C-alpha cells in the first residue's frame, strides 16, 4: 500500500515541474525583443527542493518570426523604390529649410548682441567724457573756503517776480476794507486806560479813595444819629420851655449839614477844602 502512493507522488511532482518549466520558457520568449538581437545566455537553473534527481525538459522553439528573416525584407508597407526616393527628397528639403532658419536666427541673434555691445560702449564713452569735463572744471579756479563746493559759480535760475496785488475797484470792496480797519483800530484812550489799570500807583490811589469814602460815610451816620437825638431833646425842651437846648440843637444841625455835604462831595475835594476851613 505504501509503494503505490510513493509512485503517484513522484509522477505528480514531475508533471507539475514540467508545466512550470513550460510557463517559464513562454514568459522568457515573450520578454525577449524580436528585432534581431541575440538572446542572452540562460543561467543554469537551480533545481527546486525535492527535485534534485529530476531534469527540466528542453524549452520549445518560439513561433514568432524575426524581422530579418521574413519574406518582405523590412518592406512591410510594400512601397516601390520611386516612392521611397520621393519621400527621401521631401524629407531632405524639409531638413534643409529648418537648418537655414536656424542659421538665420543665429545671424540675427549675433547682430542684436553686437548692437547692444556697441550701445554699451558708447554709453561708457559718454560717461568718461562727462567725468573729464567735471575734472577740468574742478581744476579751474580756486576754493575760498575748505567747505566751498567747486562748480557752484553757475548762474542760478532767477526767482519769479511776485505779482503786485491790484487794489479793488468796486465801492463794496472799499467799504469792506474800511469796516475791517475800523474793527482793527485802537484808540489812544483805550491804550491809556489799559496801562492805567495795570499801574500800581493808580491802584493804591483807588484804594485810598475807597477808604476815605467809608470814613466819611461812617461820620455822616454818626452825625445823623446825633441830630436825631438833638431833635428829640429839642422837642422835649420846647415842651418844657428850655432855651439852651435850642442853641445847642442849632449847632448840631450845622455840623450834621456839613457832614452830609462832605459825604456827597468826592474825597479829593474834601481834602482840598479842609485847610480852608
UniProtKB/Swiss-Prot annotation:
One of its GO terms (cellular component) is nuclear envelope. Residues 63-72, 115-142 have a biased composition (Basic and acidic residues). Disulfide bonds: none annotated. It comes from the Eukaryota. It is found in: Nucleus envelope. Its main location: nucleus. GO terms for biological process: negative regulation of Wnt signaling pathway; Spemann organizer formation; Wnt signaling pathway. The keyword Nucleotide-binding does not apply. Transmembrane segments: none annotated. This is Protein CUSTOS.
